[in-house]
A protein has these predicted regions:
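A short core secondary-structure module
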Residues: 1-31
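Glycine-rich beta->alpha junctions and the first turn(s) of the following alpha-helix
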Residues: 38-133
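C-terminal structural cap/anchor segments
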Residues: 124-177
Length: 248
């Protein structure tokens, strides 16, 4: 199948400057290798892409001159997907419990749908989904304000403008609670549904697998450190981050 669309790539010039470029995936010399074999979310722009003398447009430019809120934008995309997974977990859990016929002698009601402990689990899952959505929406609204600011001020660079850097900081603040809430929701739902919820035809495991895969794409372990470093030492988030060599 012929690829379509575009891919954002980075390349290093002869002077050591890292440049950003958007490549047409139908251009000559592009080879896409479908080698992403993660156990969850498939459409995460993962996998290998090779380029051989591939032509690009003339707007090649250093990464620090890209739109300043770019990293925040990509992260919000992942967070929105996570929030959607959490919501699906809540809806699926409620639907499954409403249809569950069997209960246990140690239960609290004649039917699972009336068992107060199981209803509590459903409520907790729904609360986790709500939290993931609300936090993501708050960060997205901040990012929208920043985008309008960038447009009005002719694309300020991230490392030159604290307003743009603070948008990245707010997204960093959102990452861990959204991930935690989503992973908790996609795990806890099984507590309300019993062993039958693990039936392969229900595929409820996909929710956790997708969430876990998304959460691993941009290491969240660093996000809290970045926030703490700003609060204690006043250091803004890094201008750009990617897979590469860590600075000492």
């Amino acid at each position: 199948v012929a690829p379509s669309g575009w891919s954002r790539e980075a390349t290093t010039g002869e002077d050591g400057t890292v440049y950003s470029v958007v490549v047409d995936l139908t251009a000559p010399g592009v080879q896409i290798i479908d080698d992403w074999n993660g156990f969850g979310q498939r459409l995460t722009a993962s996998g290998t892409c090779l380029f051989g003398n591939t032509p690009v447009e003339d707007d090649l430019r250093p990464t620090h001159q890209r739109f300043g809120y770019g990293q925040s934008f990509y992260q919000i995309y992942h967070l929105s997907t996570l929030a959607g997974i959490a919501r699906r977990a809540a809806l699926s859990a409620a639907q499954e419990l409403s249809q569950r016929a069997r209960t246990f002698t140690t239960g609290n009601a004649d039917t699972a749908a009336q068992d107060v402990q199981l209803l509590q689990v459903i409520g907790e899952v729904a609360s986790q989904a709500y939290a993931a959505h609300a936090i993501t929406q708050q960060a997205a609204q901040r990012l929208e304000h920043t985008a309008q600011y960038v447009i009005a001020h002719d694309q300020p660079r991230h490392d030159d403008d604290p307003q743009v850097a603070l948008a990245e900081l707010e997204v960093c603040l959102a990452v861990n609670p959204v991930v935690d809430a989503t992973l908790a929701a996609t795990t806890a739902l099984f507590d309300a549904l019993g062993a039958s919820a693990t039936a392969s035809n229900k595929a409820l495991d996909r929710l956790w697998r997708n969430a876990r895969t998304l959460a691993n794409h941009n290491p969240r372990v660093y996000k809290s450190r970045i926030v703490g470093n700003y609060l204690v030492n006043g250091e803004l988030p890094p201008a750009q981050w990617r897979v590469g060599v860590a600075k000492a």
